[in-house]
Design a protein with these regions (language model features):
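Gly/Ala-rich beta-loop-alpha elbow adjacent to hydrolase catalytic centers
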Residues: 119, 205-210, 214
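Domain-level recognition of soluble alpha/beta enzyme cores
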Residues: 1-114
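Active-site machinery of serine-nucleophile hydrolases
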Residues: 49-53, 57-88, 125-165
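Short substrate-entry loop that stabilizes the transition state in hydrolases
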Residues: 95-111, 116-153, 235, 258-261
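Alpha/beta-hydrolase fold nucleophile elbow
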Residues: 195-208
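Conserved hydrolase catalytic core segment
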Residues: 216-224
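The feature captures the conserved acid-bearing segment of alpha/beta-hydrolase catalytic domains
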Residues: 105-108, 224-290
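Alpha/beta-hydrolase active-site loop
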Residues: 148, 154-196
């Protein structure tokens, strides 16, 4: 497969960072859901996509990585859902062509920042096509693997796998809170490296559980805007009683997420949006059909 950027204003550069948070112990919220050890400090892998005026050609970014991540995805699905998909089904994804480059010259100006925080057993690479497109419009885009919650994270010391669903979490709110600290740790790391970006202008994209973590981050830090893709807000509501918006927030609901929870007796995400989101002047809602 080949992912091309449409209507790009800039070429896109790529780099990965290994973030070690020496003053933060491994949270229970993550080690109870994975093969992380309790006696360790927090480590994160972070992808950064940045705009450049250099020319690029499509490259097979993941071709030579040690782990076949397509196979890892299939193993996770088989383990989680009790199915028997052939492990080679997605192996071709390692050969994907992406319209990005490495070691590109940066723009003279410092670009605004967009942070991507994934959902439960998600991955920093799952929205790569969207993130590259955003970077091509002049943004520095930072995608975080929330180690232990992510489907897999290939740390230098070994691969960490998510092994637990929401039922295995002692408190889902704590997962979201610790994810919001991951975001802060990542931004602090990049700022301390004097990374070439405008960290006074930060927006966030949060998918599902990442929507909760992004909202919590913005409650404590200045955010330009908040983009919520099928946000998982019920655990937040159960913890704090209301969802108080503090910045421009765009709620994007897919058809399967919206319709799939309309008829259940428990509180659902659509009801949270309709009845418990406060400061609605900050909110815009979007509904996507044919999303599945």
């Amino acid at each position: 497969p080949k992912f091309e950027i449409e209507n790009k204003q800039y070429s896109v550069g790529y780099e990965e960072f290994h973030v070690v948070v020496s003053d933060r112990e491994q949270p229970k919220a993550f080690y109870e859901l994975s093969n992380l050890t309790t006696e360790s400090n927090r480590e994160l892998l972070v992808d950064v996509y940045y705009p450049s005026s250099d020319k690029t050609e499509a490259t097979q970014l993941f071709k030579d990585v040690d782990t076949n991540w397509g196979k890892t995805v299939i193993k996770y699905l088989n383990r989680t859902w009790g199915i028997t998909l052939p492990e080679f089904l997605l192996s071709h994804l390692n050969l994907s062509y992406l319209d990005i480059g490495t070691n590109l010259e940066r723009l003279d100006i410092k670009s605004p920042v967009v942070i991507y925080t994934h959902g439960w057993s998600g991955e920093k690479i799952f929205a790569t096509d969207q993130l590259i497109t955003i970077a091509s419009q002049g943004y520095v885009v930072v995608a975080i693997d929330h180690t232990g919650l992510a489907m897999f994270t290939e740390l230098p010391t070994g691969t960490i796998y998510n092994t637990g669903s929401t039922e295995n979490s002692s408190k889902v709110y704590d997962v979201m809170y610790e994810m919001s600290l991951d975001i802060e740790n990542t931004i602090n790391y990049l700022e301390n490296k004097n990374y070439h970006a405008d960290f006074s202008d930060i927006s966030l994209i949060g998918h599902s559980t990442g929507g909760g973590s992004a909202h919590l981050y913005c409650l404590r830090n200045d955010c330009n805007s908040l983009i919520l893709q099928d946000p998982f807000f019920v655990p937040l509501l159960e913890e704090v009683g209301t969802i108080d918006l503090v910045t421009d927030s765009y709620f994007i609901y897919s058809e399967d997420w919206y319709n799939g929870y309309e008829d259940i007796n428990d509180l659902n995400e659509i009801e949270v949006y309709r009845s418990y989101v406060k400061n609605k002047n900050f909110a815009q809602g979007f509904y996507m059909t044919q999303s599945a």
